[in-house]
Amino acid sequence: MKQTFVLLLTLMLILTASFAVAQLGEPVQDFTVVNENGTLTALSGLLQTKKAVLLHFFAGWLDEDYSDLPAVQAAYAQYGEDIGFIVVSVEEQETVQSLAAARAQNELTDLPLSLGGLSAFGQFGSAYIPLTVVVNADGTSGFEFDGVLGAEALERVLAVFVRTDGPLAMETVPQEAK
C-alpha cells in the first residue's frame, strides 16, 4: 500500500508538471477519453451542449471508488440531460473488459465509463482518488471534491449547477438542494 501511494504521488508530480494545475474558477484543459464502446469523448464537446460537465476519476484497485459509482449513476439518471458526465479510470492497465466487469459487479446500467483519465487527473493537483470535479459550461472549474462524495451531496451540488445561469465556483457542498 505504501509503495502504491509513493508511485501514485510520483506519477501525480510528473503529470502536474505537464499540466497547469486547475484551480477553482480557472480554466480546465481539454482532454479526450476512450469510452467502453471505443468512441471518443472530449470535454470540449460536452461543454458545447451541456450546462456543466461532471468529471469523476476513479481507480479499480480502490474498493471505495467502486462504492461511489452507484451514486454517480443515480446522478447521471437524474441530471444527464443537462449535465455531461465523464466517468473515467485513472488506471493505466484498465481495459474495456475490466470496465465491463466493474459495471457488472456494481450493477451499473447506463453510466458511461471511460479509459485514459490519468493525464487529465493530473491537472487538478489532487493526491486523492476518487476525485469529483464539475466544470462550468465556460470551461472553468466550478467544484472539486477529493474522496467519496456520496449520493445526497452529489445531488445537492448538481442541483445548483442545473438551476444557475453562468459559471460557479463552489468551495463546499451546499447544505441543502436549492
Q: Where do the protein language model's features map onto the residues?
A:
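Non-globular targeting/processing and membrane-anchoring segments
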Residues: T10, V21-V34, G38, V160-K178
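A short beta-strand-turn-helix
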Residues: T32-V53
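Bacterial N-terminal signal peptides
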Residues: L8-T16
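Short, internal strand/loop/helix patches
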Residues: A102-A137
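Conserved redox-active cysteine motifs that mediate thiol-disulfide chemistry
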Residues: F57-A74
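Thiol-/selenol-based redox modules, centered on thioredoxin-like
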Residues: V134-K178
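Conserved segment of the thioredoxin-like fold in thiol-based oxidoreductases
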Residues: S67, A77-G116
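Short pre-active-site segment immediately N-terminal to redox-active cysteine/selenocysteine motifs
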Residues: K50-V53, F57-L62, Y128
